[in-house]
Amino acid sequence: MKYGTMSYLSVDGKVLMIQKIKRENDPNSGYYTLPGGKLKPYERKSTQGRLEGAIRETKEETGLRLINPVFRGIILFHNRERTFDNWKNPQDYLVYIFEAKKYTGILKSSSDEGIPLWIDETEISNLPQNHGDKKMYEWLKDSRNFKGIIKHRGNILDESGTSVRYL
């Protein structure tokens, strides 16, 4: 199992996203997604560590530092039956989601992950994204915290195995 974090920074009707660069073995290659990435082993051990991981990943990818992010949810990306063009049977990925409404810093023009952009909330559903990410954005629109599972069979979202429970 892998562990990661994602940050949902929403300011004045716009959401901070990354247009990912195209690369092999990246399920988000060429897609739009939230800033985030793998947690370091010491960050996984506590809520504070996971929060610091979200702040770190967002700053690395976008140049922006989240102010007072709050925990929003946790998603298990159930990947054992998932396939990509050149990547068979990836590991499950447990992702902690944090939300912020304020930030400091200057937006980078690009990073190793892609191009950070402010996207109008009304446009997000029209962007090229992973099926699982589209489901995650639906859950984030609700103001409640959540626990979710996103499951794929092959390269298709398995709706019957995908679920959310609001807390």
Which residues does each PLM region occupy?
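Conserved N-terminal beta-strand and adjoining loop/helix that marks the start
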Residues: 1-17, 39-40
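Unchanged
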Residues: 39-67, 77-135, 139, 162-167
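Hydrophobic alpha-helical interaction segments
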Residues: 148-149
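A structure-centric signal for secondary-structure junctions around beta-strands
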Residues: 2-4, 12, 28-29, 92-94, ...
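Conserved Nudix-box catalytic region and its N-terminal flanking loop in Nudix hydrolases
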Residues: 15-56, 153-167
